[in-house]
Amino acid sequence: FNPRLEFSISLLYAFSTSSFAYSSTGLNIVPGPFVILLSFYFYKKFDLQNKSIDIILCSMTMGFSLLLRNDFIIFSLMTSFFLIYLFLKRKQKIKNFLFLFIPILFYGMIIFQINSIEFGSPFLSEYTNKNGIDIISSNFPIYEGIVGLLFSPGAGLFIFSPILLLIFISFFDFYKIDKQSVILVLSFMITIIFFYGSLSTWHGFVSWGARYLVPLTPFLLLMISASLSTRKNKLFYLLISSLAIIGFFINLLWQIQDVSWFVWGPFGGNTGLFSLGIAGLHPLNLNPLVFWTFEYSQLIKAMILAFTNFQPDMYLFKVWGIVPSSVVLVSVLAILSFKLKSLLKLQ
């Protein structure tokens, strides 16, 4: 790997995936991927250098990730299993086990204390007497959730982040470089997809794309980095550039306008995509058409809105107007791009 490759992958993650859309929100899936990616970094560092400090840092970041989201325990468990596998093959097994589990236990005590204060019991992470939709049901077909998470027109991962389609090629390229990491990422990917695919709310309500799979995105881009470093033909670079531009445009639609209001409309109202839902028939007033057809997909509706009745949702657009704001924005991006290009040349 080299600085140019690392910079390219960072740009792809920042601007051509759903992470770009969510970057302007306060959702915990925004910092979450950074934390679990950091734990993966310390895991790989220990694998290569065999230093105890990396075990401690990996354990601490995994524990901290659980404070952000409970479902990050999936990645923490996967990484812990792989660390234990490394411990068993090396010396100082007991010391390594202590370095791994003591920080995790510390964060576990914090989580138990928070649960005790908030829910009255250290073993509860939510209220058990709440009413609402039953998100886990034996009547819900898991294959529907899995296909929906990946390919549905209204919320699919590969629809809203088309650059990730390259993983079907990149897994093989990365496997030749680092088999162990591929197995870890595949394990994480399969587990989280099956977990959220089993929920009737796999779509994340009115989220832009597969919100629950956003933490998986940087790991899939790591796979793509292997293809960038090994495949040098122009056709492949043209394919990557095209998918990146499409992904940027798709997620820019969400950034520049209020999709939640102008596309979905008020909950239970007579306008927007919510108006398609029938109370008592469609859970959460979400008609399946909004997820399974392009005609009623929020993506297509947002695209039509942008070109026919654009409602800017950016502060500068409202103050200066669209044209002056666009000129300033493009100028700033051009200057930053030039400076970054100069820095990369120095590398």
Give the predicted meaning of each segment:
Residues 1-15, 33-34, 50-57:
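Transmembrane-helix signature of polytopic, membrane-embedded enzymes
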Residues 45-48, 74-105, 166-178, 222:
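Perimembrane helix-loop-helix junctions
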Residues 235-347:
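Transmembrane helical bundles and short interhelical boundary loops of multi-pass, membrane-embedded
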Residues 96-170, 185-196, 246-265:
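Membrane-lumen/periplasm interface segments of specific transmembrane helices
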Residues 13, 58-62, 101, 105, ...:
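Transmembrane alpha-helix segments characteristic
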Residues 9-14, 54-69, 76-80, 105-106, ...:
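Membrane-interface alpha helices of multi-pass inner-membrane proteins
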Residues 21-31, 117, 156, 209:
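Short acidic/glycine- and proline-prone juxtamembrane loop motifs at membrane-interface regions
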Residues 81-85, 158-186, 220-227, 236-245, ...:
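Hydrophobic, aromatic-rich transmembrane alpha-helices
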